[in-house]
């Protein structure tokens, strides 16, 4: 992984988890090797070196599971539309200073690399003028470029996000146009048309989290169904840490859960 040239700053990891999941009910409590999924995620967050790990949920059962395994847990409202909104409530409850770095470790990522969690926190600390940091990796499979479930990000010369999209960006005109619309025959991306896949891991400055709930939803956020575009619409800059290690997938479906359970010997 590409790490920033800075010592790891103090940071807080928050694991937002909710029971309401249409594809996998009670997902945070799913058993993985004898422990609930949310606990597996919190353990990975702890391994990242975070000075504090919090589980945030609107479900008492999730809070109890976290506390039973020694993790701090905080009750949040049930009406949050996103994990970022849940983090914003936690930031308000704890009253963290403006420059406190808070990493959102999604509650369905039991295989997340602790080094990546630490990496985005360090990258934000080194990215002055940015309120948010996230991560991405180069795409090598042409099929992923044209998959709308794979979010792409275009970076500027400083590694700051220019745009996130489900569309194939940047569009390599000379390489793709002769094959369009036959996606199966598209060539693999190559320099200078490097395509980056966004990794859904975020570090925030607490000051931004306090302002986030007051930001109006943006048209591009609604069209793309990507909440990070709200911050960009309102002028916030997002620093992107590029890693060449492809992260292991999270758990969205029963099949995903079975795959992860097998890795833990469940």
UniProtKB/Swiss-Prot annotation:
Annotated metabolic or biological route of this protein: Nucleotide-sugar biosynthesis; CMP-3-deoxy-D-manno-octulosonate biosynthesis; CMP-3-deoxy-D-manno-octulosonate from 3-deoxy-D-manno-octulosonate and CTP: step 1/1; Bacterial outer membrane biogenesis; lipopolysaccharide biosynthesis
Top-level taxon in the UniProt lineage: Bacteria
Gene Ontology biological process terms in this record: CMP-keto-3-deoxy-D-manno-octulosonic acid biosynthetic process; lipopolysaccharide biosynthetic process
GO MF term (any one): 3-deoxy-manno-octulosonate cytidylyltransferase activity
Gene3D superfamilies noted in UniProt: Spore Coat Polysaccharide Biosynthesis Protein SpsA, Chain A (3.90.550.10)
EC number: 2.7.7.38
Chief location category: cytoplasm
Keyword Chloroplast appears in the UniProt entry: no
Catalyzed reaction equations: 3-deoxy-alpha-D-manno-oct-2-ulosonate + CTP = CMP-3-deoxy-beta-D-manno-octulosonate + diphosphate
InterPro entries: Cytidylyl_trans, KdsB, Nucleotide-diphossugar_trans
Compartments in which it is found: Cytoplasm
Root EC class: transferase
GO cellular component: cytosol
Record keywords, A-Z: Cytoplasm, Lipopolysaccharide biosynthesis, Nucleotidyltransferase, Transferase
Pfam families found in the cross-reference section: CTP_transf_3
Family: Belongs to the KdsB family.
PANTHER family, alphabetized: 3-DEOXY-MANNO-OCTULOSONATE CYTIDYLYLTRANSFERASE (PTHR42866), 3-DEOXY-MANNO-OCTULOSONATE CYTIDYLYLTRANSFERASE, MITOCHONDRIAL (PTHR42866:SF2)
HAMAP family linked: KdsB
Purpose: Activates KDO (a required 8-carbon sugar) for incorporation into bacterial lipopolysaccharide in Gram-negative bacteria.
Annotated protein name in UniProt: 3-deoxy-manno-octulosonate cytidylyltransferase 1
Gene source species: Paraburkholderia phytofirmans (strain DSM 17436 / LMG 22146 / PsJN) (Burkholderia phytofirmans)
Gene, per the UniProt record: kdsB1
């Amino acid at each position: 992984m590409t790490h920033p040239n800075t010592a790891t700053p103090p940071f807080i990891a928050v694991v937002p988890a909710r029971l309401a999941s249409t594809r996998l009910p009670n997902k945070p409590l799913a058993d993985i090797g004898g422990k609930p999924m949310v606990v597996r995620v919190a353990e990975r967050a702890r391994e990242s070196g975070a000075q504090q790990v919090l589980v945030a949920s609107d479900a008492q059962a999730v809070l109890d599971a976290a506390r039973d395994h020694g993790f701090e847990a905080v009750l949040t409202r049930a009406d949050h539309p996103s994990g970022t909104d849940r983090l914003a409530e936690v930031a308000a409850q704890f009253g963290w200073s403006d420059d406190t770095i808070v990493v959102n470790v999604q509650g369905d990522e039991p295989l997340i690399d602790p080094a990546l969690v630490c990496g985005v926190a360090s990258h934000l600390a080194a990215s002055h003028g940015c309120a948010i940091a996230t991560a991405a990796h180069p795409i090598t499979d042409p099929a992923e470029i044209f998959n709308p479930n794979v979010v792409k990000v275009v970076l500027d010369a400083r590694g700051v996000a220019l745009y996130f999209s489900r569309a194939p960006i940047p569009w390599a005109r000379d390489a793709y146009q002769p094959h369009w619309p036959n996606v199966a025959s598209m060539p693999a991306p190559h320099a200078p048309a490097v395509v980056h896949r966004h990794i859904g891991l975020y570090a925030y400055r607490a000051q931004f989290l306090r302002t986030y709930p007051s930001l109006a939803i943006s048209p591009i956020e609604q069209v793309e169904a990507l909440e990070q575009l709200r911050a960009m619409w309102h002028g916030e800059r997002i620093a992107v840490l590029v890693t060449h290690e492809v992260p292991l997938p999270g758990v969205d479906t029963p099949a995903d859960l079975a795959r992860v359970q097998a890795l833990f010997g469940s």
